Amino acid sequence: MTEKMVETAPPGFELLPQGLGYTDTLQPVYRKVEGDSAIFGLVVGTQHSNTMGICHGGVLMTLADITATTGANLAHGVASGSPTVHLSIDFIASARQGEWLQAEAEHVSVKRRFGFSSGGIYNSAGAVARFSATVYFPDHQGMWKDGRRGDGLLKRQEEG
């Protein structure tokens, strides 16, 4: 019997800290922030898979959402607090357990109170999904009663 090879996070990626709400359900999730770009990734595990043994579409949607929003936040100069108001995704190929998935926001623009982000999710064979998102940059504190906005997904692990 042969063992299935499990890919690992490439060099330069750090584990996303716990305590970020729903994103914690994807753990372990990794990120690499360089300048004004952020890349997120994960190794597809059983917790990410559907009954066919491939990565669940909801996992891909969540990975697209955090990548698109973080890309827009970086372009706008804020760390978090910007809700996604639109997200569309095209599923192109499957990703199997043990494969490294990497999500990248490739085109980001900011217009007034909105950020627009599009990109892709890839495995070693190529594109798994393409996404497009619109993010709203509120001019108020929203639901946060104590006045904080937080630093969300951009918070460095060594600071937390």
Predicted feature descriptions by range:
Residues 1-160:
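Terminal targeting signals and extreme-terminal segments of soluble enzymes
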